[in-house]
A protein has these predicted regions:
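Conserved phosphate-binding elements of NTP-dependent enzyme cores
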Residues: 1-940
Length: 940
């Protein structure tokens, strides 16, 4: 047995459903905590071990500092020993900031900025010429070489393309002893009172010297160059008098032809989060909000009077329509003319306004005429988008706004200067747009070091970049690019990015706790992930992983299996030990691992109802103009390696098309050519893993709608009728029946000044949320608070004679959620639990049998047994005639599908093709498909 110093010991853990358990986890090992959904895995790993580690860390801060860090409750545990500093890496897309990218999160982009600031070569964004900079000595040598025997003017620029009369400047130059200046290309003698047109842009240079270049006058030439450099702030112009040719020379970066100069580059010049580097148009976001003319004029066949300009609606007697009438009259048309027949110039003025003042008639003032200005429909919409406009106005205007790629930087986020610094003909944005595998290859290629100077500067920076790119490749993220927005990443992707960042940090003696890092990862990349976790372990860290993946469990050093079931029937350690020992035990998990239990392959595949939904020419993101036919009335799985285009095809192309058709959704689908078969569907339902509510007041009862039925039931009780109670009396969200001390929360927040706030049960209602009078109304001896505290399993028996309630909660039980409480806060539900609450809600609804259900990785957070239950639910939906589309990597789900669409062959630019379609038995015959390779073993 290992010594105490080599163990993490947890004594008496009682958080959530944990049954006062003791657990021992070996340090410096890879430990998997597994078990059914709701068995207490996260309660042990995150809410006990991580929470205590975090609390101990915060305890080292001063009381003043702790006050800013929010509430950190002491977990309900007797003692934890052997705990290292803890870092939690959860499967949540935590960063919604549009400025955050894969590159900024991993800090690789910071190294790229440093590389370009130190080794980038500047080019003019006007001529494309390489920018140059000189010392005074280099300029002198260049003059003696290039201009020998020629007459030249040495000029010092003092005004560059600016307005003003410059009377005082000319006087100052004259007082310094200079006789001539060059103004806008012409040499002029300075005379007292001299000035230029103040409203025009001017270029003014001092004529410092004019001479015929000769080695004999080298000293005079040198003195003149230095003087000109001083007067021109590091910039001089040389004019070849005979050829009338001017060249620019500068101590800083400059285009020799145009005189365009750049400041000396620093890392912040390449940051889209810095004013010095960001594109001035989009402020570094890469896209801009613009009024979409197609949304303003959706149908040019109808007239303005009939509502042809969507934001204005049908003709009314108001200022906007009077102004538009005046424009129409000017072009000889009326408001009743179809928009397609109105001259383009008139439409242009209606949309974008006119500089002319319009003569309009005011009907309310006896048709009197007066002149007004007109700014256009688009300007009116933009004004409603302003920060000072009301939320309602902004929402109204938002439906006519489209986010499009910034026309100035083409989505590259940086200004023109930053984009014209290059290494090996690539600018920083082009490198950030490469997928990580391509970028790794580019840096690995010795040709990227184009000059000796760059090679010397770049060596150390390149080493850091390559090591971090390798970590991302190791966790299966080679298809992403550094420019990919963090907000667009899935939970699994963002978790693996943080994992790669942690591996790159080279920390030791840390306890890492991860939540299902294999989510979103194809079987092909699973081994890389396991190796990465072992690398983290081998550098001297302890790694605890909450995981259901079979390969991860068998590759671990130690397994803690929670169970035996979920909710109140879980919370115990049913096994703790090495994987080989676990295979010999008789637990639900071990029986799936050793083959005693398995999810069976269906004996036959459904053919569907003979109808198909066909989408053609899908080309969004990395899709290669693909077409796919989805059989209706079947369970279809969309498969492929990470980044192959699954979500692009279903979530970003197909689903928005259907949502626009059925719900008038404002979200536009990615590009596609055509879709057919949509008439055979009635609706589309997306069942994702986002929370069912974001406040503690939301719960399964409120989400499914059964709480309304329960409140109606209590309203019908004799006591409630006598007192005249309405359903609102039994709501904890409104005044009347709720406890007003805690406002229906059930707890009170105590402010502790500089210490964290503490949440304590309400002293009036003792956590029941309702006042005494409301709790006196009972059904079968139970109050409304008692009902909310029931688990679904208990509630099913309790309401067995109330069909309106039973039908809704019975479905929650059928999807495997019998262990959760009716009134359990939505904030405590896992992603998998939230998804099954949504599924149950859909199952309880009366459907026409023509619904398409779309699920994205529904197995997230699910144990083998949970997956078996989920498959039963999905099959029930299909048996009613509906269509189920699932994006999934889990082979237990894939092998049970009626139809598979496999994308690939790889991720990123190497993906986006449809490799195979058909039944699982047909898919496994494909030689190019990675999915087929692993699926073959499951079908044996």
């Amino acid at each position: 047995m290992a010594s105490e110093t080599e163990l993490i010991n947890v004594y008496g853990a009682r958080v959530h459903n944990l049954k006062n358990i003791d657990v021992t986890i070996p340090r410096d090992s890879l430990t998997v905590i597994t078990g059914l959904s709701g068995s207490g895995k996260s309660s042990l790993a995150f809410d006990t071990i991580f929470a205590e580690g975090q609390r101990r860390y915060i305890e080292t801060f001063s009381a003043y500092a702790r006050g800013f860090l929010g509430k950190l409750e002491r977990p309900d545990v007797d003692k934890i020993t052997g705990l290292s500093p803890v870092i939690s890496i959860e499967q949540k897309t935590t960063n919604k900031n549009p400025r955050s990218t894969v590159g900024t999160t991993t800090e690789i982009y910071d190294f790229l900025r440093l590389l370009f600031a130190r080794a980038g070569e500047a080019y003019s964004y006007i001529t494309g010429e390489k920018m140059v900079k000189y010392t005074d000595e280099q300029i002198l040598e260049l003059i003696l070489e290039k201009y020998i025997g020629k007459k030249i003017y040495i000029l010092a620029p003092v005004v560059r393309n600016r307005k003003g009369h410059y009377k005082e400047l000319f006087e100052q130059i004259r007082k310094k002893g200079y006789l001539n200046v060059r103004v806008d290309g012409d040499i002029r003698e300075i005379i007292p009172g001299m000035k230029v047109d103040r409203y025009k842009n001017h270029n003014i240079e001092i004529l410092v010297d004019k001479l015929v270049v000769s080695n004999k006058f080298a000293d005079k030439l040198k003195a003149s160059v230095r003087t000109a450099m001083k007067q021109g702030s590091g910039l001089i112009l040389l004019q070849d008098v005979e050829a009338d040719e001017v060249r620019h020379y500068s101590r800083s970066l400059m285009c020799p032809t145009t005189g365009l100069s750049y400041s000396e580059p620093a890392p912040h010049n390449f940051s889209f989060n810095s004013p010095q580097g960001a594109c001035p148009r989009c402020k570094g976001l890469g896209d801009v909000d613009q009024v979409d003319i197609e949304k303003i004029i959706p149908n040019p066949d109808i007239s303005i009077s009939a509502g042809g300009i969507a934001p204005l609606g049908k003709e009314k007697s108001n200022m906007l329509f009077w102004q538009i009438t005046a424009i129409c009259e000017k072009y000889g048309v009326t408001l009743k003319t179809p928009i397609k027949d109105i001259p383009e110039e008139a439409i242009e003025e209606i949309l974008y306004g006119t500089n002319e003042r319009l003569k309009i008639k005011n009907e309310s003032l006896g048709n009197s005429n007066y002149m007004v200005s007109y700014e256009g429909v688009t300007k009116y919409i933009e004004m409603q988008q302003d920060d000072e406009a009301s939320a309602t106005a902004q929402k109204w205007a938002g439906q006519y706004i489209t986010t499009s790629v910034c026309p100035e930087c083409n989505g590259q986020r940086l200004n023109k200067e930053a984009l014209h610094f290059k290494i090996n003909e690539k600018n920083i944005a082009e490198l950030a747009d490469m997928d990580i595998q391509t970028l790794f290859d580019w840096f690995s290629d010795s040709e990227t070091e184009v000059t000796e100077k760059q090679r010397l500067i770049a060596t150390e920076i390149k080493k850091e970049i390559l090591s971090r790119l390798q970590f991302l490749l190791d966790v299966g993220l080679g298809y992403l690019s550094l420019s990919r927005a963090s907000a667009s990443l899935s939970g699994g992707e963002s978790q693996r990015i943080r994992l790669a960042t942690q591996i790159g940090s080279q920390l030791v003696n840390v306890l890492y706790i991860l939540d299902e890092p294999s989510i979103g990862l194809h079987q092909r990349d699973n081994r890389k992930l396991i190796d990465s976790l072992k690398k983290l372990r081998d550098t001297g860290n302890s790694v605890v992983v909450v995981e259901h993946d079979k390969d991860m469990m068998l590759a671990s050093d130690y397994i803690v299996d929670m169970g035996p079931f979920a909710g109140r029937k879980g919370g115990e350690v049913v096994f703790a030990g090495v994987p080989d020992e676990m295979l010999k035990r008789n637990t639900l998990t071990s029986n799936y691992l050793n083959g005693k239990l398995e999810i069976a392959v269906p004996k036959k595949r459904r053919k569907g109802n003979g109808k198909h939904l066909i989408i053609e020419g899908a080309s969004g993101n990395n899709l290669k103009n693909v077409s796919v036919s989805l059989p209706l009335g079947t369970f279809t799985c969309i498969t492929g390696v990470s980044g192959s285009g699954k979500s692009t095809l279903i979530n970003e192309t197909l689903q928005p098309i259907l949502s626009q058709k059925f719900y008038r959704s404002l979200k536009d689908p990615l590009p596609y050519e055509s879709i057919s078969g949509i008439e055979d569907l009635d609706k589309v339902v997306s069942v994702d893993q986002s929370p069912i509510g974001r406040t503690p007041r939301s719960n399964p009862a409120t989400y499914t709608g059964v709480f309304s039925d329960i409140r109606t039931l209590f309203t019908g009780m004799p006591e409630a009728k006598i007192r005249g109670y309405k359903p609102g009396r039994f709501s904890f969200n409104v005044k009347g029946g709720r406890c007003e001390t805690c406002k229906g929360n059930g707890y009170k927040t105590i402010e502790m000044n500089f210490l964290p706030d503490v949440m304590v049960p309400c002293e009036s209602c003792h956590g029941k949320r309702y006042n005494r009078e409301t709790l006196e109304v009972r059904f079968k001896g139970k109050s409304i608070a008692d009902v909310l505290d029931m688990t679904i399993n208990v509630a099913v028996d309790f309401f067995e004679n109330v069909p309106s309630i039973l039908n809704k909660i019975k479905v929650l039980q059928e999807v495997g959620l019998g262990y959760i409480k009716l009134g359990q806060s939505s904030t405590t539900l896992s992603g998998g639990e939230s998804q099954r609450v949504k599924l149950a809600t859909e199952l309880a609804r009366t459907d026409t049998g023509n619904t398409m259900y779309v699920l994205d990785e529904p197995t997230t957070g699910l144990h083998f047994e949970d997956i078996r239950v989920l498959l039963g639910v999905l099959n029930k939906l299909v048996e009613k005639g509906n269509t189920v589309i699932v994006i999934e990597h889990n082979l237990d789900i894939i092998k049970c599908a009626d139809h598979i669409v496999d994308l690939g062959p790889d991720g990123g630019e190497k993906g986006g093709y449809i490799l195979a379609t058909g039944t699982p038995e047909e898919i496994v015959k494909n030689k190019e498909s990675y999915t087929a390779l692993y699926l073959r073993e499951e079908l044996v």
